[in-house]
Amino acid sequence: MAGHIQDRWYKTESGPDGKPTRIKTERYGNGLRYRARYVGPDGTERSRSFPDRQKRRAEEWLAETAADMSRGQHVDPRAARTTFQQYAERWIAGQSTDLNTRIGVETRLRRHAFPRIGARPLGSFRPVHIREFVRDLENDSIGGSYARNIYANVRAVLSAAVDDGHLARNPCSAASVRPPAVSAARVVPWLPSQVRAVRDALPERYRAMVDVGSGCGLRQGEIIGLAEDSVHLDSDSLRVATQIKLIRGVAVFAPPKGSKERDVPLPSSVAYALRQHMKSHPPVAIKLPWIKPDGPLTERRLIFANTADGIVWRSNFNVHEWKRALAAAGLIPTPDLGKPYASARQHGMHALRHFYASVLLDAGESIKAVSEYLGHSDPAMTLRVYAHLMPSSSERARRVLDDVFGTAQES
């Protein structure tokens, strides 16, 4: 790296005898004396000024800059002055993930990160600032997986800023930084009797939704978006290819989560329930935008529709139909007249997926197969959520031996 230090208080000129002589400049005694200059990787000259008696510091700064450039860790001082919010907004706009995911990231950053660290220049970030950020979240009673998601978004922004040369290293990577703690709440699956009770308490037109959720493991958006041509009654399989999701209040058709289409076994009991349902409630042709609100209109013949032959809006369904069924089944209390139902996050329609997974695992199905049926990103995720539901090896051994010796004794 080519660099040099300019003394702005003195200049060198040739004297009468032709020898170089140092003379004071018109700036002598005013302002910062030394200006260290170098040419950055992009060919642009950069500089930093130092006061009188700090020429050695200017030399050290040039040496540090040269070392950073040789290691590929050079940070443009002007880029380092970009604030976290300025960079994060550009980063969000450049993400290629689905629109709903981007909206979620933007919402978390705007609500919780920008007010706390948005104005901080990227080049000034140190581990202490991230530790303070995490503590602020905890002090404001923002915790659990939601706080972990906020932290993950902040870390991703800072990681991209490192890649783009705005800071030398990600402060979130420091050993002293700990992400927000997440309590390891275990999934407690419903009993078969509870599944039946909730099903029986729903209006007749919605009961087969419980069969699909508990018997095929679909997510709520996948159940609501289940089309007639996805159900293969003759081959005993169900193709999960579409879901209905809301993008800023607009319903759209979209691929399943993670764009992972999948085939799942269709139990005969679920197939029967769907046949009976479609006899009473024939599939309804629905047109919605594809993936985003301004996407092309796409038509699907949906198996489940509301009383007006429109899509089942999950917000209305969850409050007015699902919670009423939960209360009737004794899973949540019945509210006083005029009062809303209690929060029932652990008893949402996702509970049907938990029931489905627990039944398969108890029957000895492999984690890999269950992961594929559920549409998880990888089996490790399935294992983290459901490992405690897997029968122990000793329990499996007892079952096998009881079957063998029980049969032998009976014969």
Locations of the language-model features?
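Catalytic-site neighborhood detector that most strongly recognizes the C-terminal catalytic loop/helix
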Residues: 53, 181, 189, 244, ...
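Basic/aromatic DNA-contact patch characteristic of tyrosine site-specific recombinases
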Residues: 1-86, 90-94, 103-107, 124, ...
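Short, basic (Lys/Arg/His-rich) helix/loop patches that form interaction surfaces
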Residues: 140, 197-207, 216, 264, ...
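N-terminal core-binding DNA-recognition domain of tyrosine site-specific recombinases/integrases
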Residues: 28, 47-49, 54, 80-81, ...
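C-terminal secondary-structure termini that scaffold catalytic or DNA-interacting sites
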Residues: 1, 139, 200, 230, ...
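Basic, Lys/Arg- and aromatic-enriched nucleic-acid-binding interface segment
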Residues: 144, 148-152, 163, 167-226, ...
